């Protein structure tokens, strides 16, 4: 694991990450309010394409996207999941917080195989 700065996140006890596999995403809720989601696709080789980071307008620019990605990445790390980031926010996040680079798959993308 690469070291680097640690992302600051919201520490509210009412924040909850909910897996929503039917919609291919992880949802962030605060009490009963929907904050946003991280859209994902599980690929043939078991890696996860992280495609979209969306936060409701009312919660924008308050650090919720960073909190959402951090929560999901911490869960992926615990589960041994590798990612293939295509979301531009996630690509920027990985540049700012290289301690999560170990999650990035180092095998060829199965979608690019003939």
Residue positions per predicted region:
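Non-catalytic substrate-recognition and accessory regions of acyl/acetyltransferase enzymes
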Residues: 1-58, 75-79, 96, 109-114
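Conserved acetyl-CoA pyrophosphate-binding loop and the N-cap/start of the following alpha-helix
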Residues: 59, 63-68
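Conserved acyl-CoA
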Residues: 67-82
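Short, hinge-like loop/turn segments at secondary-structure boundaries
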Residues: 101-104
């Amino acid at each position: 694991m690469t070291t680097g700065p640690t992302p600051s996140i919201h520490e509210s006890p009412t924040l909850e990450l909910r897996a929503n596999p039917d919609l291919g995403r992880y949802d962030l809720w605060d009490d009963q309010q929907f904050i946003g989601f991280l859209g994902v696709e599980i690929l043939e080789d078991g890696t996860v394409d992280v495609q979209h980071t969306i936060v409701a307008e009312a919660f924008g620019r308050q650090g919720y996207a960073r909190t959402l990605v951090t929560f999901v990445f911490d869960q992926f790390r615990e589960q041994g999941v590798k990612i293939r980031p295509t979301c531009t926010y996630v690509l920027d996040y990985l540049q700012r917080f290289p301690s999560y680079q170990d999650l990035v798959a180092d095998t060829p993308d199965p979608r690019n195989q003939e």
